[in-house]
């Protein structure tokens, strides 16, 4: 996406879309990782976790796992920073938390969590739709008038992006993010 569409969206949405595009094109992976403080990742995820319809046990699992992280790193470019938190201790609720955050708006472009404990993840179309609608609201991309649900993901022709949610109980994984 070289040029953003000519629609009535605010500067924060444009900033967020530029960061999302950088992340989705793979250019955000061109820098080296550096160890970062867990507080930085928690701060970046705070609004996101509050906005999404996670069960309270999921929010607690994320925060508990981040606070007890074995390793946390960040890498990124001018617009996007990707945080990864690993827990080697399988007693922790989450084994891995990954979040790509657009720097200017501090909005999450993509998020995934892999649980190491027996947390039940409800996987239904209505649950996925709830996550997608909350994400569009949270990211303020709900201002784009053409988001259409195609049976598995939302798609905006205006910006050429999909919004996908995976709730995988078998692999104990939750993923939410924009995709090409």
Spell out what each predicted region is:
Residues 25, 53, 104, 136-140, ...:
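Short, flexible coil/linker elements and helix-boundary hinge sites characteristic
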Residues 1-63:
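N-terminal, intrinsically disordered, polar/charged segments of Gram-positive cell-envelope systems
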Residues 19, 26, 57, 68, ...:
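Generic detector of low-complexity/intrinsically disordered segments
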Residues 10-12, 17, 32, 37, ...:
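Serine/threonine-rich low-complexity intrinsically disordered regions
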């Amino acid at each position: 996406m070289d040029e953003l569409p000519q629609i009535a969206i605010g500067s924060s949405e444009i900033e967020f879309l530029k960061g999302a595009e950088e992340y989705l094109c793979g250019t955000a992976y061109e820098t080296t990782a550096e160890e970062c403080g867990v507080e930085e990742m928690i701060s970046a995820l705070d609004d996101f976790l509050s906005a999404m319809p996670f069960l309270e046990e999921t929010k607690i699992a994320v925060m508990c796992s981040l606070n007890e992280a074995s390793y946390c790193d960040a890498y990124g470019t001018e617009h996007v920073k990707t945080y990864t938190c690993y827990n080697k201790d399988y007693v922790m609720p989450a084994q891995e938390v990954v979040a790509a955050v657009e720097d200017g708006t501090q909005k999450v472009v993509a998020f995934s969590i892999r649980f190491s404990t027996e947390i039940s993840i409800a996987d239904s179309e209505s649950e996925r739709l709830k996550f997608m609608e909350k994400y569009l609201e949270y990211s303020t991309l709900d201002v784009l008038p053409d988001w259409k649900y195609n049976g598995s993901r939302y798609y905006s022709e205006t910006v050429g992006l999909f919004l996908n949610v995976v709730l995988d109980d078998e692999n104990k994984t939750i993923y939410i993010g924009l995709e090409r």
